[in-house]
Curated annotation (Swiss-Prot):
Domain of life: Bacteria
Similarity comment: family membership: Belongs to the aerobic coproporphyrinogen-III oxidase family.
This protein's name: Oxygen-dependent coproporphyrinogen-III oxidase
Principal subcellular localisation of the protein: cytoplasm
Biological source species: Francisella tularensis subsp. holarctica (strain FTNF002-00 / FTA)
Active site feature: H114
A GO MF term: protein homodimerization activity
Gene Ontology cellular-component terms listed: cytoplasm
SUPFAM superfamilies (alphabetical): Coproporphyrinogen III oxidase
Keyword tRNA-binding attributed: no
UniProt cross-references to Pfam families, sorted A to Z: Coprogen_oxidas
Chain positions of site Important for dimerization: H183
Enzyme class: oxidoreductase
């Protein structure tokens, strides 16, 4: 099992380099991803041990902020959040390896994107370890274009159909349901793919699906960035982007499994919260004008069949 974990780690660290390099090619000023390598001290008082590399870009003309973060951590006991629905895992040691990214563009016409790919092994130090994969990618437009959502979902469907034709409808529905702000009765964006507890096939089959899915992120996102990054925008457009970013913050702090797991398990706070946007606003009881571009967004970011 250790050999398989290391193979996935090697894949993720290479993917991290591929993604940051591809995104930098679209940046028009001197902004670059900086590498912040870290390691948790192996001391008795540390609940979580391990290491990682958070790659951050800030202040770009195209990407106002972005993070592509790799981590490999282990602990003696899964935190309560991770075992709430799987009591058989309570008290088990664990290893978690993953890559998580969030890209916040400056231009309101370029959507925010998020992706995450990970493996968990519970009881890795026992004769019967329990493994599963999780991950996916989703898109959060501020001023959406239907063709962008279609391209995003078509890319997702193509990669799913290559492995299992039941995956896309199942993981799309899961994504729609997961990225939902219950307290606002709003969806975060136009969705994509979300899956967890993936071990329905052999390890190698699941590994191949997850790595193919991870490799398709750039195919899904880069064409959208290229198409929208030079659209002129006004302060009104920027203000609405900042307002909608507030919803992104709310979701990450209240509902996001990765954030909650990281904080409960004693993870590296600076890396966990690096996905937050550089700026966001909240307005009391704000409502968009009837018939405005902003009002149309709320009708757009609802679950639908993007691929006819």
């Amino acid at each position: 099992m250790q050999e398989k974990i290391s193979k996935f780690e090697d894949f993720l660290t290479q993917l991290q380099q591929n993604i940051t390099t591809a995104l930098e090619q679209h940046e028009t000023n001197a902004a670059k991803f900086i590498s912040d390598k870290w390691q948790k001290p192996d001391t008795p008082d540390q609940k979580l041990k391990g290491y990682g590399n958070s790659m951050i870009i800030e202040g770009g003309e195209i990407f106002e902020k972005g993070v592509v973060a790799f981590s490999r951590v282990h602990g003696s006991e899964l935190p309560p959040f991770a075992t709430a629905k799987r009591q058989e895992l309570a008290g088990k040691s664990f290893i978690a390896t993953g890559l998580s990214l969030v890209i916040h563009p400056r231009n309101p016409f370029v959507p925010t994107s998020h992706a995450n790919f990970r493996i968990f092994i519970a009881g890795a130090d026992t004769d019967n370890p329990i493994w599963w994969f999780g991950g996916g990618f989703d898109l959060t437009p501020y001023y959406p274009f239907e063709e962008d959502a279609i391209h995003w979902h078509q890319t997702a469907k193509n990669i799913c159909d290559k492995h299992d034709k039941t995956y896309y409808p199942k993981f799309k529905k899961w994504c729609d349901e997961y990225f939902y702000l219950k307290h606002r009765d709003e969806y975060r964006g136009v969705g994509g793919l979300f899956f967890d507890d993936l071990n329905d096939k052999s390890f190698d089959e699941c590994f191949n699906f997850v790595t193919d899915c991870a490799n398709s992120y750039l195919d899904a996102y880069i064409p959208i960035v290229a198409q929208r990054k030079n659209i002129e925008y006004s302060q009104k457009h920027k203000d609405f982007q900042l307002y909608r970013r507030g919803r992104y913050v709310e979701f990450n702090l209240v509902f996001d499994r990765g954030t909650i797991f990281g904080l409960q398990s004693g993870g590296r706070t600076e890396s966990i919260l690096s996905s937050m946007p550089p700026m966001a606003t909240w307005k009391y009881n704000w409502q968009p004008e009837l018939g405005s571009e902003e009002e149309k967004v709320y009708q757009y970011i609802k679950p639908r069949d993007w691929i006819k």
